[in-house]
Amino acid sequence: MAEITAAMVKELRESTGAGMMDCKNALSETNGDFDKAVQLLREKGLGKAAKKADRLAAEGLVSVKVSDDFTSATVSEINSETDFVAKNDQFIALTKDTTAHIQSNSLQSVEELHSSTINGVKFEEYLKSQIATIGENLVVRRFATLKAGANGVVNGYIHTNGRVGVVIAAACDSTEVASKSRDLLRQICMHIAAMRPSYLSYEDLDMTFVENEYKALVAELEKENEERRRLKDPNKPEHKIPQFASRKQLSDAILKEAEEKIKEELKAQGKPEKIWDNIIPGKMNSFIADNSQLDSKLTLMGQFYVLDDKKTVEQVIAEKEKEFGGKIKIVEFICFEVGEGLEKKTEDFAAEVAAQL
């Protein structure tokens, strides 16, 4: 058997673009015959797949798998090079099979996935064979799984175009409430897919971030007010400049002060004290809404619900708690969008041809 040197492996790798170990194995199987090794790699699709690996895969699909008992929800993103392949039935099946494999084997990382076994072969080899068949570079970019704790429940949603997927987990105070909450969680996932909140609640916001955003908000509103004053349109009154941007800033002392101010106004208006309890909650809600505009933009709980824009997600959950007879606390959500954070590689036809010559 011919000796397989590092120089031979390097030459084959540069010629075919295949991986180092694939080149070494091909040379071993062909007794060092370079041309036969090239042909073997082509027959296996390994050279073709590896050669494509420098092409950015920024299209693709997001897939969601929710276990039958609603205790585990997995979301994954697998990228392709073109939107055309993302609509390919074989690629769609690949994304579903991979997501189910991730969930059933409790995999935690892409590295762990590649070293796992699927259908009797290493996943890395399985993916290479799919690349060779489909004809484009495919990349498992990321995945995540949420688990339900005791009396917990999970659910998920995949948007019809397959480009946005969401999974969510909630903690409840009984299995009965958890079971009743399944549909609610799916609907909240739909809301997340549409509104893309960045945070779960105002409690997750950093105070320095909030303070900086407040300055930006005031500057934006003042600029709009300046334009409205110029136009003098009676249908577009000036914005009221809020004192705060988030409930993160509304301490107990601030809320108490606001309530006392409302009482003073009611007294000045001559409203009898016996009806104050009916008026104050609504005015306090208005005060909080006016001073938490950042929450309504960035946080799930503070956003107005897409299925009922008169209520926030937090208010909808509170109503369901009364209906179901128990507590429902959203613990975590994860939203993936295809290509999020990736920069698509664009070339004109002439440049693409030149790059291949």
From Swiss-Prot:
Gene3D superfamilies: 1.10.286.20, DNA helicase RuvA subunit, C-terminal domain, Elongation factor Ts, dimerisation domain
CDD domains with a match to the protein in the record: UBA_EF-Ts (cd14275)
PROSITE patterns attached to this UniProt entry: EF_TS_1, EF_TS_2
Region (Involved in Mg(2+) ion dislocation from EF-Tu): 82-85
GO terms for MF: translation elongation factor activity
SUPFAM superfamilies: Elongation factor Ts (EF-Ts), dimerisation domain, UBA-like
Domain of life: Bacteria
Keyword rRNA processing in record: no
Keyword flag Zinc: no
NCBIfam families: tsf (TIGR00116)
HAMAP family membership: EF_Ts (MF_00050)
Chain's role: Associates with the EF-Tu.GDP complex and induces the exchange of GDP to GTP. It remains bound to the aminoacyl-tRNA.EF-Tu.GTP complex up to the GTP hydrolysis stage on the ribosome.
Family that this chain belongs to: Belongs to the EF-Ts family.
Protein's recorded name: Elongation factor Ts
